[in-house]
Design a protein with these regions (language model features):
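Active-site-adjacent segment of SDR/Rossmann-fold oxidoreductases
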Residues: 99, 120-131
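Active-site helix of classical SDR
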Residues: 74, 110
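The beta1-alpha1 cofactor-binding region of Rossmann-like NAD(H)/NADP(H)-dependent oxidoreductases
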Residues: 10-21, 56
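A glycine-rich helix->loop->beta "capping" turn
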Residues: 3-6, 24-35, 43
Length: 218
């Protein structure tokens, strides 16, 4: 209230909640110029550590929050943005959607899907005046980070403060960049993956083995 904002409890996995959020925001403030879709959820490959071991319930939860929440948001705001011939969709995804996250298959898979949807938005609606950006950090100091000091495999290139990620986002929006990479080395990893997929997979296997043989935080 102090900054003139509006806070609404919203379950982003429920489309009706997002529609209500958009309607209430536009009722109070007018048309939405920028919609930031930021919610995410991550689960580890448990209980047995295989890539398919995460429960069906957690797979579906990841799909609803990491993918469908972006779909629901776009569905709610696109008609108005297209009519006005302007608008910006900013989706928080993850470097896991460009590369992979060791030990979190449901997270990596749904983040790849989120990237694909954002690409479809940019391709389909760029000529409608709609801008799209995806934010793809590695480890960020939030409650989603695994419970050990170094952040695990995703903390290999350092753990960023939320404020640092925010600065990257502001710069990326100013440049209207589709891909916003707070950890700059992710771009290099993408190039290596694209240039030799098998070599990249072998490298990821070695990285996984090193973390299995070394206890977290050591």
């Amino acid at each position: 209230e102090e900054i003139g904002g509006l806070a609404l409890k919203t379950d982003v996995s429920v489309e009706a909640d997002i529609v209500r959020l958009v309607n209430e925001a536009e009722k109070q403030f007018g048309p939405i110029d920028v919609f930031c879709s930021n919610a995410g959820v991550a689960d580890q490959d448990e209980p047995d550590g295989t890539a398919a071991s995460c429960s069906n319930e957690n797979w579906l939860k990841a799909w609803q929050i990491n993918v469908m929440a972006h779909v629901y948001a776009a569905r709610a705001v696109l008609p108005g943005m297209i009519a006005r011939k302007q608008g910006y969709l900013l989706n928080t995804v993850s470097a896991a959607g460009l590369l992979n996250q060791i030990g979190a298959a449901s997270y990596s898979t749904t983040k790849h899907a989120a990237i694909g949807f954002a690409e479809a938005l940019a391709i389909t609606h760029g000529d409608d005046g709609i801008k799209v950006s995806v934010v793809c950090p590695q480890a960020v100091a939030t409650q989603m980070l695994p419970d050990f000091d170094d952040g695990g495999p995703q903390g290999l290139d350092g753990i960023l403060a939320p404020e640092d990620v925010a600065d990257s986002i502001v710069a990326g929006l100013a440049e209207e960049s589709f891909l916003i990479l707070p950890h700059e080395r992710v771009s290099l990893y993408m190039q290596r993956k694209a240039s030799d997929y098998d070599r990249w997979l072998n490298g990821m296997r070695r990285l996984r083995s090193s973390f299995i043989s070394t206890p977290p935080g050591k």
